[in-house]
Amino acid sequence: MKTSKWIDISQPLNNDIATWPGDTPFSYEVLWSKEESGSVNVGKLTMSIHTGTHIDAPFHFDNDGKKVLDLDIQVYVGPTRIIDVSNLESIGKKELEKFHLEGVERLLLRTSSHGKANEFPDIIPHLRADIAPFLSEKGIRLIGVDVPSVDPLDDKELAAHHQLFKHSIHILENVVLDHVADGDYELIALPLALSDADGSPVRAVIRPI
C-alpha cells in the first residue's frame, strides 16, 4: 500500500517573515562559524513565539491559563478536515452549519485572505465567539486558521480565544492552505516542550487519508 507524502502547511521562518507590529522581529544568525569554532556552525535564534505557524496556550490571554507543557499533545496529532470559508468578513456558527462536521476532531479553515508571509495584514477575517459552542457540540478539539489570529487584529477582548478554550478547543494560527485541497488529512502540528510558554511555533504537516 502506497503511503501519501507529507505536505508542509507551515510558514517558513526567515529574516523577512512578518511579525505582529511592535513584537520581536525574527532573526537567525550564525553565532560561531565552523571556521571560528574549528568544528561546527552554531546558530542563534531570536523570535516571538507568535511568529509564523504557531499554537496559542491559554496563558497567552489568561494569567491563570495552562502553559504549553500543560497542553494535551494528542490534540495536535490526528485526522483533520480542511474546508473553504473564503470571502467572508467573519466566521461563526451560521457560516459553518452548511458543512458536514460530524466526527471531525480537528478543523482547518481556509480563508485565502492573506497569502504573504512577509507582510502583516491590515485586516483579517475573524472567528465570532458563537463558533466555540457550535464546534464543541460537533466534538471538534482543535481549530486552525490561515491568518495570524482568530480574533480581529485590533481587538483587546479576544472573545474568540476565550470562548474556544472555555470549550476546550485548541488554537492553531498562520497555517498555509492555499496549495492544498479541501478534504480529510492526517495532521501533525506539535508544539515544542516549552515549560512556561504562552504558545509555541510548530512545523505543521498534513497528508491525505
Swiss-Prot record:
<keyword id="KW-0378">Hydrolase</keyword>
<dbReference type="InterPro" id="IPR037175">
    <property type="entry name" value="KFase_sf"/>
</dbReference>
<feature type="binding site">
    <location>
        <position position="56"/>
    </location>
    <ligand>
        <name>Zn(2+) 2</name>
    </ligand>
</feature>
<comment type="pathway">
    <text>Amino-acid degradation; L-tryptophan degradation via kynurenine pathway; L-kynurenine from L-tryptophan: step 2/2.</text>
</comment>
<feature type="binding site">
    <location>
        <position position="56"/>
    </location>
    <ligand>
        <name>Zn(2+) 1</name>
    </ligand>
</feature>
<feature type="binding site">
    <location>
        <position position="54"/>
    </location>
    <ligand>
        <name>Zn(2+) 1</name>
    </ligand>
</feature>
<feature type="binding site">
    <location>
        <position position="20"/>
    </location>
    <ligand>
        <name>substrate</name>
    </ligand>
</feature>
<feature type="active site" description="Proton donor/acceptor">
    <location>
        <position position="60"/>
    </location>
</feature>
<protein>
    <recommendedName>
        <fullName>Kynurenine formamidase</fullName>
        <ecNumber>3.5.1.9</ecNumber>
    </recommendedName>
</protein>
<feature type="binding site">
    <location>
        <position position="173"/>
    </location>
    <ligand>
        <name>Zn(2+) 2</name>
    </ligand>
</feature>
<comment type="function">
    <text>Catalyzes the hydrolysis of N-formyl-L-kynurenine to L-kynurenine, the second step in the kynurenine pathway of tryptophan degradation.</text>
</comment>
<feature type="binding site">
    <location>
        <position position="173"/>
    </location>
    <ligand>
        <name>Zn(2+) 1</name>
    </ligand>
</feature>
<keyword id="KW-0823">Tryptophan catabolism</keyword>
<feature type="binding site">
    <location>
        <position position="50"/>
    </location>
    <ligand>
        <name>Zn(2+) 1</name>
    </ligand>
</feature>
<dbReference type="GO" id="GO:0004061">
    <property type="term" value="F:arylformamidase activity"/>
</dbReference>
<dbReference type="GO" id="GO:0019441">
    <property type="term" value="P:L-tryptophan catabolic process to kynurenine"/>
</dbReference>
<feature type="binding site">
    <location>
        <position position="161"/>
    </location>
    <ligand>
        <name>Zn(2+) 2</name>
    </ligand>
</feature>
<dbReference type="GO" id="GO:0043420">
    <property type="term" value="P:anthranilate metabolic process"/>
</dbReference>
<keyword id="KW-0862">Zinc</keyword>
<dbReference type="Pfam" id="PF04199">
    <property type="entry name" value="Cyclase"/>
</dbReference>
<dbReference type="GO" id="GO:0008270">
    <property type="term" value="F:zinc ion binding"/>
</dbReference>
<comment type="similarity">
    <text>Belongs to the Cyclase 1 superfamily. KynB family.</text>
</comment>
<dbReference type="GO" id="GO:0004328">
    <property type="term" value="F:formamidase activity"/>
</dbReference>
<comment type="subunit">
    <text>Homodimer.</text>
</comment>
<dbReference type="InterPro" id="IPR017484">
    <property type="entry name" value="Kynurenine_formamidase_bac"/>
</dbReference>
<dbReference type="InterPro" id="IPR007325">
    <property type="entry name" value="KFase/CYL"/>
</dbReference>
<keyword id="KW-0479">Metal-binding</keyword>
